[in-house]
Amino acid sequence: MAKRKVRRPVAQIYGSAINLEGCEVACLHPEAIRPVLGRSLSRDGSVTVAALFGVLADPSRARILHLLAITDDLCVCDIALVLGMSVSALSHQLRFLRERGFVTRRKVGRMAYYRLDDDHLRRLVLDGAAHAAEVVA
């Protein structure tokens, strides 16, 4: 005997149909979802956020971004010295970050200075560092 598929109702909330297929309990809490309707992250937005955190997931890039978040701008040699990285490895990471719009480069003669120009990213990096310090402590 074939198992009969139970069809869940489609709820109407503020003119939007919500398919409850797969819900174990067909129960909605309008008071809980009313404040967030239309405010949740879009699919495109979630891709952007995931890409941002993907860039930050690399420890070398996180250290570079944190250093640039706590200063105005630094030349490649200074960043390499502070972080204990080779200029070659650092240049590779800086190019990666610049191509994705995380840092900007200013050339003065043969010197290249990098800076973090996005205040949202600066706050995110600084908050992440503060959180890491609390977790480690």
Give the ranges of each region predicted by the language model:
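Divalent metal-coordination and catalytic microenvironments
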Residues: 57, 90, 97
